[in-house]
């Protein structure tokens, strides 16, 4: 409520995420919405692109956020989440089993203050990832031709 931002929860795994997102919306003092229908990738990318920042615990959420240059706070429940946050150069993460609301607020403050810089950093990460994907595609095609 400090920044007058509405929370939109995007469920990448609706069956698993609904209980957690519902509880979060009930606990909020501001507005909260849950998108738990099956959305296309393009639609999800649009929602994430339009966000000020994303709080995500699903790997695809982090990947989508990086690809559209949206700052992200990772909720770490698995080493793959920490690995992706490290790869993206993003320091803001909370443990899933004990997220601290004061730490979360501090992360949100830092992201709001430094959003442009963080987005530029994510743009570089996305560009490098696209280059690696292209190199891998060329390598895969060369292996198929052999």
For the regions a language model picked out, list residue spans one by one.
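Active-site anion-handling motifs in enzyme catalytic cores
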Residues: 1-146
């Amino acid at each position: 409520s400090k920044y007058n931002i509405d929370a939109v929860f995007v469920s990448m795994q609706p069956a698993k995420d609904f209980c957690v997102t519902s509880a979060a919306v009930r606990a909020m003092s501001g507005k909260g919405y849950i998108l738990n229908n099956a959305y296309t990738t393009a639609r999800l990318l649009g929602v994430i692109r339009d966000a000020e920042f994303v709080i995500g615990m699903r790997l695809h959420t982090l990947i989508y956020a990086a690809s559209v240059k949206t700052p992200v706070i990772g909720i770490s429940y698995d080493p793959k989440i920490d690995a992706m946050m490290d790869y993206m150069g993003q320091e803001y993460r909370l443990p899933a089993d004990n997220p601290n609301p004061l730490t979360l607020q501090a992360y949100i403050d830092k992201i709001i203050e430094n959003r442009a810089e963080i987005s530029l950093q994510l743009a570089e990460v996305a560009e490098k990832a696209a280059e690696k994907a292209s190199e891998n595609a060329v390598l895969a095609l060369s292996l198929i031709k052999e």
